[in-house]
Amino acid sequence: MQALVNKIWYQGHPLRWLLLPLSWLFAVITYVRRALFRLGIKSQTVMPVPVIVVGNITVGGSGKTPTVIYLIELLRQHGFTPGVVSRGYGVDIQGVKTVNLGASAAEVGDEPAMIVARTQVPMVVGAKRVDAANALIAEFGVDVIICDDGLQHYALGRDIELVVIDGQRGLGNGLLLPAGPLREGAWRLDAVDFIVNNGGPAAKGQFEMQLAPTEVKPVKCDLTSGEYSFDKSQPLVAMAGIGNPARFFESLRAQGYQLALCQGFDDHQPYDKTQLRDLAQDLPLLMTEKDAVKCRDFAQENWWYLAVNAKLSPQFDEQLLARLREVAAAKQGNFHGIR
């Protein structure tokens, strides 16, 4: 099914025209929804600290999670105390839930588990991001909130909108769901503060981001503190349950890994030991960091993951920090006046 969807969205398959009436209906629904917030019929909650929303206008992976991790580290380096809120995709969360270090993907979602494992950032997940943001401030006293994948969640007021787009796939056929991959029209890019192009080339007004691979590490938790080595010249099985698995496989080939088999899975898909053991047979299994957080409890000794770090320009850092400081100063003045 996913292969057919990709053909419709990214390869000009004629079935897109049959789905176009549904896309028109989707366009009306999204327009009305935005209008309700713009007219004040539906309320938007303004937080006492700056809110940075990281999202995209397409369905599927574009590099949001590495961008969130990059922002966490950037803000910390410049004296901020950031926290993160997220929906916790695929997890039925009643109310809100704090993401503790070591939390499983089944409890909080794979991306929140990965973000906290990597950064130990204060993080709260919940279906209502406003409730999650309030809990984050009350429990941790953060001074900046990063909202992971909340561009279309208009109930949460935002001060800075950052959209990540896939430099390889772009906006696909440019059509709204379900005929195309767009959650909102391309016009939405004109309304955001920052556009990050994952992989480039960046168009005018965009900032190029590259994902730099780190060292290969064992998935099995009790191996991470010991000595280990990985021979990239040996044949291996590669797997990826992300929005664009092909991108991961292409990156591995470019780095010289010998891929005997590549297996893509649906984004956020859960795994079990038997499934992956049968996939790998006796070969090493190499996966993404996001996949690894779902496999730690049953990982084999020859299962590995490759993490990536986002790289952005100093110009991006300077402009984002300048904008954030402006917002923070205005918020302090406004809320001090209210008190």
From Swiss-Prot:
ATP binds at T58, V59, G60, G61, S62, G63, K64, T65. It is an enzyme of class 2 (transferase). It holds the Pfam family LpxK. GO terms for molecular function: ATP binding; tetraacyldisaccharide 4'-kinase activity. It comes from Shewanella baltica (strain OS185). This is Tetraacyldisaccharide 4'-kinase. InterPro entries: LpxK, P-loop_NTPase. Transfers the gamma-phosphate of ATP to the 4'-position of a tetraacyldisaccharide 1-phosphate intermediate (termed DS-1-P) to form tetraacyldisaccharide 1,4'-bis-phosphate (lipid IVA). Its EC number is 2.7.1.130. It comes from the Bacteria. Pathway: Glycolipid biosynthesis; lipid IV(A) biosynthesis; lipid IV(A) from (3R)-3-hydroxytetradecanoyl-[acyl-carrier-protein] and UDP-N-acetyl-alpha-D-glucosamine: step 6/6. GO terms for cellular component: plasma membrane. One of its GO terms (biological process) is lipid A biosynthetic process.
